[in-house]
UniProtKB/Swiss-Prot annotation:
A single Gene Ontology CC term: plasma membrane
UniProt-listed InterPro entries: DUF1328 (IPR009760)
Membrane topology: Multi-pass membrane protein
Intracellular or extracellular location(s): Cell membrane
Transmembrane segments: 5-25, 30-50
Pfam families in alphabetical order: DUF1328 (PF07043)
Key words, A-Z: Cell membrane, Membrane, Transmembrane, Transmembrane helix
Family (UniProt): Belongs to the UPF0391 family.
HAMAP family for the chain: UPF0391
Gene source species: Burkholderia multivorans (strain ATCC 17616 / 249)
Protein name, per record: UPF0391 membrane protein Bmul_5473/BMULJ_06024
Length: 53
């Protein structure tokens, strides 16, 4: 479960680079939304991984 949390964290960082880097307006908005979604998924999987141990 912790592995999935790290994967979602990396995806969130990549989305942040694209979203906050100023590539294009449309892509930036999508990347910002994806960033927040994957951060939430990262936190949920991190908590589930800690609780199950």
């Amino acid at each position: 479960m912790l592995r999935y949390a790290l994967i979602f964290f990396v995806i969130a960082i990549i989305a942040a680079v694209f979203g906050f880097g100023g590539i294009a307006a449309g892509a930036a908005e999508i990347a910002k939304i994806l960033f927040y979604i994957f951060v939430v998924i990262f936190l949920v999987t991190l908590l589930l991984g800690v609780v199950r141990r």
